[in-house]
Amino acid sequence: MNRTVYFADRAVAFTAEAPGGAWYAVAAEACGGISRAKILNFLESHNSVAVVSDDPDRAFAAFAAECTPVEAAGGVVVNDCGEWLMIHRNGRWDLPKGHLECGERIEECAAREVEEETGVAARVVRPLCETLHAYYFPKTARWELKRTHWYELHASGCAGLTPQTEEGIDSAVWCAPREVADNLRDAFPTIRCVAAAMGRN
């Protein structure tokens, strides 16, 4: 699959071939794209939708043009004991992340968001992957397409966790591998993608 956009727990892939399995395949329109309205309609009855096109990049671009682009960064913070830093945000397990600020480098954003959301100072080790997340933002009455750049980061020590409660975070914890696996069952698919990228690299 060329690109996958997540709508909370549901996914839309833009691909050249129908993937089969649990994916519900739909053909791109004659213009090469597909409207956001049609995608949302398909997602009402299917968890995974594949938009099949001879030019998946064009189909994705047509969809993306109907959304406001947002850049963000976050990461998997690993301490000296091999534990991961996870947060519990709005009822789901998550990883620290947030929007890119004006004039900020994307790696700087990842480290800043980690510190703001958890109180942990960490340094970027390497890039991991990117995820795409589409959502409706009521304050501006618009759809946004958030591209999050994910990194592995390292932090020394295990203390000093301060969850940013104003961002809906009720806890920040260091998790051993078994705890990470358990928590990922109650995380959004984008977070599971990041965990998989950690395992591949």
Predicted regions span which residues?
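Short hydrophobic/aromatic beta-strand or adjacent loop that forms the aromatic wall/cage
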Residues: 2, 72, 146-150
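Nudix hydrolase/Nudix homology domain
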Residues: 5-7, 16-24, 28, 159-201
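Acidic surface patches and DE-rich sequence motifs
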Residues: 7, 79, 88, 137-138
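Conserved Nudix-box catalytic region and its N-terminal flanking loop in Nudix hydrolases
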Residues: 23-26, 78-116
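Acidic, metal-coordinating catalytic segment for phosphate/diphosphate chemistry
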Residues: 33-74
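Conserved beta-strand and immediately adjacent loop positions that scaffold enzyme active sites
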Residues: 74, 83, 171
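Active-site beta-strand termini and strand-to-loop segments that position acidic
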Residues: 77-80, 153-155
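Unchanged
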Residues: 100-188
